[in-house]
């Protein structure tokens, strides 16, 4: 079932990207904004990359002194649906629920987390949240919706990176993975003046090759142990309803702990997220609070 869900979500990803939209984790969508509203492309980034504007869906690879790809293990690349072909020793979370000792997968308090913004739908969620929470944002959405990104910050929420354009990382080359991460970091730096500390892989697709690259950026991998599958509300999947999601939330409340995966890239998922927030209440934590660590690697004035 996990493999089928991943295949389905990637197929929807391809459709929405062709329509000029940016797909959210596991299927929900976040529309890209108008170019004239973008975060200005900073001079320091032009000097470093010799480019003058933000990239499209496929960002170019820019070598970095502190990223040594010779230290990355040589593991097979794989695509959605190919889990039976890869070794369990690759420690794939999306295939085998395999986690590394450094991965964050849960929290001692039941807490919501949100992927794929910033997006217009995010604004409604920000107005209703009663506590600090964690947003994992796409770089391409960050530069296209800088005002919404700033609203997230103004309300004191924690922001982590979710790559530049939501690619299935295990299918990419090492250089392409670096590009997805570095451009997302630069987008956050230019828009929010900080260097993120937390990283969530799109689709939860991560193995030890991807981890090795992520760790060289100094990022902490954040996964989840409670999945709402709210993206199925966007795809009109008959196997998931709002009522079923809220029933799961009530069950999870009894456990009083865990990290919930949700999405803020679409109006429908935000509507459910607000109801979930009302059910759980404000006694929730950010990822940094869950593990007793700092919000960002660095902040800039």
Swiss-Prot record:
In terms of PROSITE patterns, this protein maps to: NODB (PS51677)
InterPro entries xref list:
Glyco_hydro/deAcase_b/a-brl (IPR011330), NODB_dom (IPR002509), Polysacc_deacetylase_ArnD (IPR050248)
Metal-binding in keyword set = yes
Q: Name the coenzymes or cofactors required.
A: Co(2+)
* EC number per UniProt: 3.5.1.41
Gene Ontology molecular function: any one: metal ion binding
Keywords per UniProt: Carbohydrate metabolism, Cell wall biogenesis/degradation, Chitin degradation, Chitin-binding, Cobalt, Disulfide bond, Glycoprotein, Hydrolase, Metal-binding, Polysaccharide degradation, Signal, Sporulation
Gene Ontology cellular component terms for the protein in this record: prospore membrane
Instruction: Indicate the secretion signal residues.
Output: 1-24
Positions that bind Co(2+): 116, 162, 166
Query: Any idea where this protein resides?
Result: Prospore
Q: Domain named NodB homology: which ranges?
A: 108-288
Q: Where does acetate bind?
A: 115, 203
Per the Swiss-Prot or TrEMBL record, the active site comprises 115 (proton acceptor), 263 (proton donor)
Q: Which reaction does it catalyse?
A: [(1->4)-N-acetyl-beta-D-glucosaminyl](n) + n H2O = chitosan + n acetate
Q: Please tell me where this protein is predominantly located.
A: other
| GO biological-process terms attached to the record | ascospore wall assembly; chitin catabolic process; polysaccharide catabolic process
Q: Which residues are glycosylated?
A: 26, 50, 68, 189
Disulfide bonds listed in the record? 107-290
- At the top level of its lineage, which domain of life is listed? Eukaryota
Task performed by this protein: Hydrolyzes the N-acetamido groups of N-acetyl-D-glucosamine residues in chitin to form chitosan and acetate. Chitosan is a component of the spore wall.
| Family as reported in the entry's similarity comment | Belongs to the polysaccharide deacetylase family.
Concerning PANTHER family, the annotation shows:
CHITIN DEACETYLASE 1-RELATED, GLYCOSYL TRANSFERASE-RELATED
**Protein name (record):** Chitin deacetylase 1
């Amino acid at each position: 079932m996990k493999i089928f869900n991943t295949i389905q979500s990637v197929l929807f990803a391809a459709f929405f990207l062709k329509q000029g939209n940016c797909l959210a984790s596991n299927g929900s969508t976040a529309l890209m904004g108008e170019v004239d509203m973008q975060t200005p492309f900073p001079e320091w980034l032009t000097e470093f990359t010799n480019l003058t504007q933000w990239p499209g869906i496929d960002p170019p690879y820019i070598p970095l002194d502190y990223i040594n790809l010779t230290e990355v293990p040589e593991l097979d690349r794989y695509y959605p649906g190919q889990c039976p072909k890869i070794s369990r020793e690759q420690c794939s979370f999306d295939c085998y629920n395999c986690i590394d000792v450094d991965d964050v997968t849960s929290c001692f308090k039941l807490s919501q987390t949100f992927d794929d913004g910033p997006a217009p739908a995010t604004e409604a969620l920000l107005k209703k949240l009663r506590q600090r929470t964690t947003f994992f944002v796409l770089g391409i959405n960050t530069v296209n919706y800088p005002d919404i990104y700033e609203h997230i910050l103004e309300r004191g929420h924690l922001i982590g990176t979710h790559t530049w354009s939501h690619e299935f990382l295990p299918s990419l080359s090492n250089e392409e993975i670096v590009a997805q991460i570095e451009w997302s970091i630069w987008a956050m730096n230019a828009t929010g003046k900080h260097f993120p500390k937390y990283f969530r892989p799109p689709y939860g697709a991560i193995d030890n090759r991807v981890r090795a690259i992520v760790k060289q950026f100094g990022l902490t991998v954040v996964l989840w142990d409670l999945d709402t599958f709210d993206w199925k509300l966007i795809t009109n999947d008959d196997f998931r309803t709002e009522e079923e999601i809220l029933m799961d939330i009530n069950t999870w409340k009894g456990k009083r702990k865990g990290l919930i995966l949700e999405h803020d890239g679409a109006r429908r998922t935000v509507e459910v997220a607000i109801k979930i927030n009302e059910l759980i209440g404000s006694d929730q934590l950010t990822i940094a609070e869950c593990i007793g660590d700092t919000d960002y690697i660095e902040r800039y004035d």
